[in-house]
Design a protein with these regions (language model features):
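Zinc-dependent metallohydrolase catalytic domains
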Residues: 1-127
Length: 127
């Protein structure tokens, strides 16, 4: 399921991500994100955090994850990395991971009309 999801990502016109090459790292991102979110929930359960700048603690957790992978990369490097790197490009470490995390849907009230929405039966749920 995850291989197909990433194989369908067009990173540049005519160039798709390689879900087979990146499978191990994509699964690691998925698992790590789930474990990190559980740790976040555990760390804040006795001292809940408030809304800051209009964002809930849960939203800020996912925004921090997305910010970690933000960056600019030239098309030439996208081509090289897509063909040789077992890690997905930063953009897809975010936009490829979050749609498989139910807590992200809950935090941002994601619905079927939102661009990154993935139907529950098509989401990867390893943990």
């Amino acid at each position: 399921m995850m291989v197909d999801f990433f194989n369908n990502i067009e990173v540049l016109p005519g160039l798709h991500a390689n879900g087979e090459l990146t499978l191990g790292e994509n699964l690691a991102d998925h698992g790590g994100l789930n474990v990190a979110y559980l740790a976040f929930q555990n760390a804040t359960k006795d001292a809940p955090l408030g809304v800051v700048d209009g964002f809930t603690p849960e939203q800020r957790f996912f925004l921090a994850y997305a910010t970690l992978w933000a960056g600019n990369i030239r098309d030439e490097q996208i081509r090289v990395y897509t063909k040789s790197d077992p890690h997905s490009l930063g953009r897809w470490r975010v936009n490829g991971a979050l749609p498989h995390i139910q807590a992200w849907y809950d935090a941002f009230h994601i619905t079927p009309s939102d661009p990154l929405y993935v139907a529950p039966e098509k989401r990867v749920n390893v943990w």
